[in-house]
């Protein structure tokens, strides 16, 4: 009986330690990691570091998302491409899986679309709207249980970082 309790506490403690390692990165941490420019669809665009967010999963793998200046892109690209997503771990968005790598993303018409760096769509999932949010910001991650929300203003998608 005592052995079972000890084992149970070790399992609970191990789970808590793993969760404690997962965190949203601070602004200073993001500044050290974020690129100053991002290559997408044949061009490099300036990264809006102030509108870049990141997280670290329990294994220490980093995910960065940031907005870019799309003024040099064609209208067709600029309409759907708003930012970059760099991930060292597999991500899941509403059943759609994204392997480690570098991507473009955009929120448009109730959808969150992820594209490869050649601007080909990889997947689109429905985005949600958080009307209760008092002070929306251009881009941020927020913890949501064991997952995260990636916000662009009031629009968001839920993402799980493995």
Q: Each predicted region: which residue ranges?
A:
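Bacterial N-terminal signal peptides that target proteins for export
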Residues: 1-10
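Detector for intrinsically disordered, low-structure N-terminal pre-sequences
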Residues: 10-11, 16
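Sec/Tat signal peptide C-region and signal peptidase I cleavage site
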Residues: 16-22
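Primarily secretory-pathway and cell-envelope proteins
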Residues: 22-76, 124-162
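Mid-length scaffold segments of soluble, non-membrane domains
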Residues: 72-118
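Short, charged/polar low-complexity linear motifs in solvent-exposed/disordered segments
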Residues: 111-112, 116-119, 131-132, 140-141
């Amino acid at each position: 009986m005592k052995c079972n309790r000890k084992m149970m506490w070790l399992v609970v403690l191990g789970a808590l330690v793993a969760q404690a390692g997962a965190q949203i990165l601070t602004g200073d941490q993001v500044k050290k990691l974020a690129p100053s420019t991002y290559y997408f669809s044949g061009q490099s665009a300036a990264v809006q570091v102030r509108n870049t967010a990141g997280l670290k999963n329990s294994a220490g793998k980093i995910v960065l998302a940031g907005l870019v200046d799309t003024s040099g892109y064609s209208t067709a690209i600029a309409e759907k491409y708003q930012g970059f997503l760099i991930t060292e771990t597999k991500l899941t968005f509403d059943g759609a899986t994204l392997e480690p790598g570098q991507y473009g993303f955009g929120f448009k018409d109730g959808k969150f679309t992820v594209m490869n760096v050649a601007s080909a769509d990889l997947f689109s999932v429905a985005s949600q709207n958080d009307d209760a949010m008092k002070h929306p910001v251009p881009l941020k991650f927020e913890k949501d249980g064991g997952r995260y929300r990636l916000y662009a203003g009031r629009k968001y998608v839920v993402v799980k970082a493995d």
